[in-house]
């Protein structure tokens, strides 16, 4: 699953086997889950 680093804004793939979650580029620990590019449309009631 792809995440985006809050500091350097790069896309990061997280390895869940590794104990900690960090950006490999800047070392920042806050990662945001990227939203899909598709738009969901719902019919109004």
UniProtKB/Swiss-Prot annotation:
Location of this chain's protein in the cell: Cytoplasm
Extract one GO molecular function annotation from the record. zinc ion binding
Kindly report the protein's main subcellular placement as a broad class: cytoplasm
GO CC: one term?
A: DNA-directed RNA polymerase complex
Query: According to the UniProt record, what class of enzyme is this?
Result: transferase
A biological-process GO annotation: DNA-templated transcription
Q: Domain of life, per the record?
A: Archaea
State its Enzyme Commission number(s). 2.7.7.6
Q: Mind listing the UniProt keywords for this protein, alphabetically?
A: Cytoplasm, DNA-directed RNA polymerase, Metal-binding, Nucleotidyltransferase, Transcription, Transferase, Zinc
Give the co-factor note. Answer: Binds 1 zinc ion.
Read off the InterPro entries from this record.
RNAP_P/RPABC4 (IPR006591), RPABC4/Spt4 (IPR029040), Rpo12 (IPR023464)
Catalysed transformations (reactions): RNA(n) + a ribonucleoside 5'-triphosphate = RNA(n+1) + diphosphate
Q: Which SMART domains does the UniProt entry name for this protein?
A: RPOLCX
Q: Which residues bind Zn(2+)?
A: 8, 23, 26
The cofactors it requires, by name, are: Zn(2+)
Provide the assembly information: Part of the RNA polymerase complex.
Q: Which family does it belong to?
A: Belongs to the archaeal Rpo12/eukaryotic RPC10 RNA polymerase subunit family.
Q: Which HAMAP family match?
A: RNApol_arch_Rpo12 (MF_00615)
Q: What does this protein do?
A: DNA-dependent RNA polymerase (RNAP) catalyzes the transcription of DNA into RNA using the four ribonucleoside triphosphates as substrates.
Q: What is this protein called in UniProt?
A: DNA-directed RNA polymerase subunit Rpo12
Gene name in the database record: rpo12
């Amino acid at each position: 699953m792809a995440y985006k680093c809050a500091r350097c804004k790069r896309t990061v793939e997280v390895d869940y086997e590794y104990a900690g979650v960090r950006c490999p580029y800047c070392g920042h620990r806050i990662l945001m889950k990227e939203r899909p590019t598709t738009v969901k449309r719902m019919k109004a009631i």
